[in-house]
C-alpha cells in the first residue's frame, strides 16, 4: 500500500486528486494539509511514502 499526503491550499484541487487516487487499489490518502503549518502537523500523525505538494503553498 502506498501512503500519500496531499498538500494544496485549494480544497477543490485536493478533492480532485484524492478522488483520482482512491480509485487505485494500492494507494491510500493518509492525510491532507492546506498550509506548511498543517503539513508539519499531518506528518507527525500520518505516515506517508509520497507527498503531493503545491510549491506555492502558503506558510
Model features per residue range: what roles?
Residues 9-12, 38:
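Intrinsically disordered, low-complexity regions enriched in small/polar residues
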Residues 11-31:
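Two-component/phosphorelay signaling modules centered on CheY-like receiver
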Residues 13, 58-59:
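The feature encodes the CheY-like receiver
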Residues 32-50:
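Acidic, metal-coordinating helix/loop segments flanking the phosphotransfer/catalytic sites
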Residues 1-3:
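Non-catalytic signal-transmission and effector/linker regions of two-component phosphorelay proteins
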Residues 54-55:
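Active-site residues of response regulator receiver
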